[in-house]
Amino acid sequence: MQLPRNVIAGPGAIRSVGDLCRSMRLKGRGLIVTGKTTKQIAGDIVADSLREAGYGADFLLVENATMENVEKAEALARELKAEFLLGVGGGKSIDIAKIASTRLNMYYLSIPTAASHDGIASSRASIRHDGETVSMQAEAPLCVLADTSIIVRSPYKLLAAGCGDVISNYTAVLDWKLASRLRNIYFSEYAAALSQMTAEIVVNSAHMIRPGLEESAQEVVKALVSSSVAMSIAGSSAPASGSEHKFSHVLDRIAPKPALHGEQCGVGTILMMYLHGGDWEKIRDALNTIGAPVTAREMGIEDKYILQAMTEAHKIRPERYTILGDTGITLEAAEKVARATGVIE
């Protein structure tokens, strides 16, 4: 079981990174993996805090989460004799730091500038390799440091997408239970309960999640970390990734302009909850209250891609059994579900 040793979320939290590293007994140089914009937003503050605490601090600027950039991070860390890595920014920077540090057998810190998905604290990363985005096993971060005064200034749609990613735990757990019954897959009651409870908290708090409120950012960060912990307990992503994530992964491949991961997972949850015979209206209403998209039009994706994703989703990670079964659903069934839920008109 891999869990972060420390999670700090609050206004101004990023300025304590140097002290946090000392309390974790880290030594030497830190390599900060970040993007051009996030360096200005948070990376420079992280570097200053590290230097004030007596650490060396260097940067690697990246744009995409690719194996090429992972290898660049590894090479630079070796060249600089860095002792630990810090992923500062969105999912791409954190995922690169996550995989590079795992391959180097180093600690890394996760310092998100947005709360858009549960990768900020998980032990899995999405990396582009050989033209495909693959999910890779990694180590969980040593610490997660989420500065809500920075996160709350990020585009609100990122926070809303984070809610969609958490809410998708509902159908992920249902799929996991189904796989356990039909395929004798390992099922952890504790991990499933934590994952479902996390989704329920976000749904029940939907009316309190608003733009510009640090309290909203803090609640979503805690939910994302909790979701990551559920995955760590399970030893897999099953508590937080089921048929709705498969649907999202297909959209990433086929849609000319995919929506955010959490947005697609949120809409996928509406569709898959309908297939499960559950309360899909509750999911839709919560997402709508939060301000996340609930239709293909709101995601900016044509109806035909929604239907194609629904019929092809079962092909993603076929070893993970879901409500879609081994053969998937027909185009006619997909259209019926999508129209019944209002995802397409």
From Swiss-Prot:
Regions annotated as coiled coil: none
EC number: 1.1.1.261
Binding residue positions for substrate: 118, 165, 249
A Pfam family that the UniProt record links to this protein: Fe-ADH_2
Residues noted as binding NAD(+) in the record, renumbered to the chain: 91-95, 113-116, 122
Binding positions (Zn(2+)): 165, 245, 261
GO terms, biological process: glycerophospholipid metabolic process; phospholipid biosynthetic process
Keyword vocabulary terms for this entry: Cytoplasm, Lipid biosynthesis, Lipid metabolism, Metal-binding, NAD, NADP, Oxidoreductase, Phospholipid biosynthesis, Phospholipid metabolism, Zinc
Gene Ontology cellular-component terms listed: cytoplasm
Localization annotation: Cytoplasm
CDD domains noted in UniProt: Gro1PDH
Annotated GO MF terms: glycerol-1-phosphate dehydrogenase (NAD+) activity; glycerol-1-phosphate dehydrogenase (NADP+) activity; metal ion binding
Cofactor(s) named in the record: Zn(2+)
Cofactor detail note: Binds 1 zinc ion per subunit.
Keyword Lipid biosynthesis: yes
Biological or metabolic pathway of the protein: Membrane lipid metabolism; glycerophospholipid metabolism
Principal location class: cytoplasm
Function: Catalyzes the NAD(P)H-dependent reduction of dihydroxyacetonephosphate (DHAP or glycerone phosphate) to glycerol 1-phosphate (G1P). The G1P thus generated is used as the glycerophosphate backbone of phospholipids in the cellular membranes of Archaea.
Protein name according to UniProt: Glycerol-1-phosphate dehydrogenase [NAD(P)+]
Record organism: Methanocella arvoryzae (strain DSM 22066 / NBRC 105507 / MRE50)
Lineage, highest ranks first: Archaea, Methanobacteriati, Methanobacteriota, Stenosarchaea group, Methanomicrobia
Gene it is expressed from: egsA
